[in-house]
Amino acid sequence: MGALDDLRVLDLTQVLAGPYCTMLLADMGADVVKVERPGGDLIRSNPPFVSDGDEEAYGGYFQSVNRGKRSLELDLGTDEDREAFLSLVERADVVVENFKAGTMEKFDCGYETLREHNPDLIYSSIRGFGDPRTGETHRQGQPSFDLIAQALGGVMEITGQSDGPPTKVGPGVGDLFTAVLNAVGILAAVHHRERTGEGQYVDTAMYDSMVSLCERTVYQYSCDGESPTRQGNSHPTLFPYDSFEAADGHVVIAAFADGHWETLCEAMERPDLAADYPDAGSRIANRESLRREIADWTATIDSETLLDLLEGRVPAAPVQNTADIFDDPHIHDREMLTDVDQPGADEQITIAGSPIKMTETMPSPGGRAPLLDEHRAELLDEAGVGTGTNRVESDD
């Protein structure tokens, strides 16, 4: 039993932001129906593959963010499929899409039309620049992807080394953070509907989300009138809070609190530093020289020895790669790696598990991602429009 096992979601999204949002809901038990355009989600054929892309139904990208969903292929441009979709809407709690503003209206399936079929429907969109219903801007006709959102929202300007160019954050935070916020908005709307009976429109823009993610830069600029820029792995108001090279790799140390600083100086056998720089202000004012002192120390010690010296008393960690993560007992104890079947392959694929843990209704990936149109017969039967015939045969 999942916390959301009474929630029916129609997911018209594709690529990353929308599918990740509905994946979070599916992991918590929601019945997520992936309504796919003819030919399916654009990323079904994206690599990597376990062995042979010609044999496998989809790649790891699609598998990772579409696990636990059901699939129905519909062409909303045809009367038959549009009517089938509207029948599904009548039985749904939530509709999610991530098309450019106005796309659903072209099929006469916009929010206002769907509300006529289901007055308490929660309709949610993820767009680069939001929907005119919640605030019209000149950008809303423009396309957007993660890279665009990171560039506009200030993420790239504050990421990278101080003497280097603006740099994209590795994970697609323009998509992923927006997706998480949109899921929060959907659940808030569900709660509101339970109290009032009112459905509503939930709108989350990628650009807006990146500004929210960079909240620190907003108040900094408001206070001093200077645009924050790149500082490598350091922090503008905390020290030491940085990465350092050890004898066998890199570590990060976050010893900005006075007690942590004293413990770090003790491990370095430098009580003079603790005495000379006892407070945050003095450490920040002398951060460059102090960073050199710490870097000279870490360079002579391997990561494991360094962390043993700090004995869990100072926040510190090695910089791990993905192979290290796969070997970390913590990750296995927390069930953060999940093996699922990969249709067309002889072995399973590992995907990231759910980071949301609950004592009574533990979220969990609900099995592999669906084949295109795999659940057509059962979904059309549930919608009361006939069983239909699967356009793509299931491998089950």
Curated annotation (Swiss-Prot):
EC supergroup of this enzyme: transferase
Keyword field: Transferase
Regulation: Shows highest activity at 4 M KCl. Does not require divalent ions for activity.
Active-site residue numbers: 175 (nucleophile)
EC number: 2.8.3.26
Catalysis: reaction(s): mesaconate + succinyl-CoA = 2-methylfumaryl-CoA + succinate
UniProt cross-references to SUPFAM superfamilies, sorted A to Z: CoA-transferase family III (CaiB/BaiF) (SSF89796)
Signal peptide start-end: none
InterPro entries documented for this protein: CoA-transferase_III_domain, CoA-Trfase_fam_III, CoA-Trfase_III_dom3_sf, CoA-Trfase_III_dom_1_sf, Scnl_mescCoAtase
GO molecular function, one term: CoA-transferase activity
Record-stated family: Belongs to the CoA-transferase III family.
Assembly, per entry: Homodimer.
Function text: Involved in the methylaspartate cycle. Catalyzes the transfer of the CoA moiety from succinyl-CoA to mesaconate to generate mesaconyl-CoA (2-methylfumaryl-CoA) and succinate. Also shows high activity with methylsuccinate as CoA-acceptor, and only low activity with glutarate, acrylate and itaconate. Cannot use other CoA donors like acetyl-CoA, propionyl-CoA, butyryl-CoA or acetoacetyl-CoA.
Name recorded for this polypeptide: Succinyl-CoA:mesaconate CoA-transferase
Native source species: Haloarcula hispanica (strain ATCC 33960 / DSM 4426 / JCM 8911 / NBRC 102182 / NCIMB 2187 / VKM B-1755)
Underlying gene: mct
